[in-house]
């Protein structure tokens, strides 16, 4: 398959590593929700846990992006996978909400570092005409991991009514995926930095604000915030929605895997489709479809109905994410692309901090299903940005 779509070797290696990393984090996060429920967490506390995942990345993303040129993209990826392996093992021993919150914050930083490394590698090593396609491959790998992780988690953790038999087994399986993510990175052990990133004497924050003033950059980053927040909230709140509607953890794992699978399918030939239809038009259609089917989830009260709505939403969300990656990269000169990627990720994490916390409050008052209506409203607001 890799040869048939003419994937460069470095992209193939990055795909293997990133898909394994995403399998790990996509397994860990639902297990965090289930572990919190085992410890008696309320819907509001579940929302706080989801928000804490993004809290420190909000502060660190710009700084980390500004320093990619000093350490190299490959080292970021290796560090992210290594710390994720150690944290996944640590999660299996946690039996307090406070420690669970601290570990959740740490896994958010670990994942961020790896993502900055991977996305910067693509943005600096790819010709402009290949950005849509190469980011599509990268996002394909992410979806593959997001599909495999919850499936394996549902099988390994087992089912005891609406909760897993063993969340610890789920966390240990996540550690295994993180270890797999490390193996292909030995190929990069002697790799040189692709492009030395620019040094802005006015400071990282000032440089980022200046970049946001570039025509189209602010709009692209807001769309990215809306899409990433929607995906993040689905991962965190589908387990809670499942417990409210008597879905087994395995059923929830399958539904999460379906979302990732349809996203993965939409990304295989993204480059060719974007060239034919145009990136802007394709992004607009994907946001509209995401809005409609996130709202449809509110009315789904069986695993099959929810699975159908999630599948179509996943297909649409899967298109939007990589298109915002390539758009942000195109709007920045090569020497500033790491900072542009980090500005986008900062916005994503702001959304992933604010939206889950708000969703937790909504779920506590009106049930987890109402969260999906909130996501639809957020996505709808980005439609006007894309026009």
Annotate the PLM regions.
Residues 105-142, 327:
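Cytoplasmic helix-loop-helix junction between adjacent transmembrane helices
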Residues 54-62, 146-147, 260-268, 352-353:
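Residue-level signature of mid-helix packing/kink "hotspots" within the transmembrane helices
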Residues 1-8, 190-221:
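Juxtamembrane intracellular "pre-TM" segments in multi-pass secondary transporters
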Residues 175-196, 385-387:
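C-terminal membrane-cytosol helix-exit motif in multi-pass small-molecule transporters
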Residues 60-72, 266-278, 363:
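Helix-to-loop junctions at the C-terminal end of transmembrane segments
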Residues 25, 106-118, 312-324:
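Core transmembrane helices of Major Facilitator Superfamily
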Residues 8-54, 219, 223, 228-241, ...:
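Helix-loop boundary and gating motifs at the non-cytosolic
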Residues 75-89, 281-295:
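Structural signature of the two symmetry-related core transmembrane helices
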């Amino acid at each position: 398959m890799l040869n048939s779509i003419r994937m460069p070797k470095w992209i193939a290696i990055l795909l293997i590593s990133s898909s394994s990393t995403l399998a790990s984090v996509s397994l860990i996060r639902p297990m965090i929700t289930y572990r919190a429920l085992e410890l008696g967490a309320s819907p509001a506390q579940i929302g706080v846990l989801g928000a804490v995942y993004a809290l420190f990345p909000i502060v660190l993303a710009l700084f980390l992006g500004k320093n990619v040129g000093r350490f190299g993209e490959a080292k970021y990826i290796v560090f992210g996978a290594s710390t994720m392996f150690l944290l996944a093992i640590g999660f299996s021993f946690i039996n307090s909400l406070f420690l669970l919150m601290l570990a959740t914050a740490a896994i958010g930083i670990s994942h961020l570092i790896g993502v900055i490394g991977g996305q910067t590698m693509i943005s600096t090593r790819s010709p402009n005409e290949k950005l849509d396609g190469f980011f599509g491959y990268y996002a394909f790998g992410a979806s593959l991991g997001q599909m495999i992780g919850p499936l394996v988690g549902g099988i390994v953790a087992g089912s005891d009514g609406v909760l897993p038999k063993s969340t610890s087994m789920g966390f240990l399986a996540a550690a295994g995926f993180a270890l797999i993510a490390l193996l292909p990175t030995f190929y990069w052990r002697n790799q040189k930095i692709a492009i030395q990133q620019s040094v802005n004497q006015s400071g990282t924050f000032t440089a980022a604000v200046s970049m946001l003033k570039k025509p189209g950059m602010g709009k692209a980053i807001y769309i990215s915030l809306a899409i990433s927040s929607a995906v993040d909230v689905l991962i965190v709140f589908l387990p809670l929605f499942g417990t409210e509607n008597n879905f087994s953890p395995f059923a929830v794992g399958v539904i999460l895997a379906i979302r990732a699978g349809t996203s993965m399918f939409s990304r295989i030939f993204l480059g060719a489709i974007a060239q034919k239809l145009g990136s802007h038009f394709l992004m607009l259609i994907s946001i509209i479809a995401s809005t409609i089917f996130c709202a449809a989830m509110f009315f789904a009260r069986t695993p099959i109905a929810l699975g159908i709505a999630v599948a179509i939403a996943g297909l649409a969300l899967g298109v939007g994410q990589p298109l915002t990656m390539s758009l942000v990269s195109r709007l920045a000169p090569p020497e500033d692309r790491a900072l542009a990627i980090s500005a986008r990720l900062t916005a994503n994490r702001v959304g992933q901090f604010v939206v889950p916390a708000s969703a937790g409050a909504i779920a506590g008052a009106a049930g987890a299903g109402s969260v999906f209506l909130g996501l639809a409203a957020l996505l709808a607001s980005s439609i006007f940005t894309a026009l």
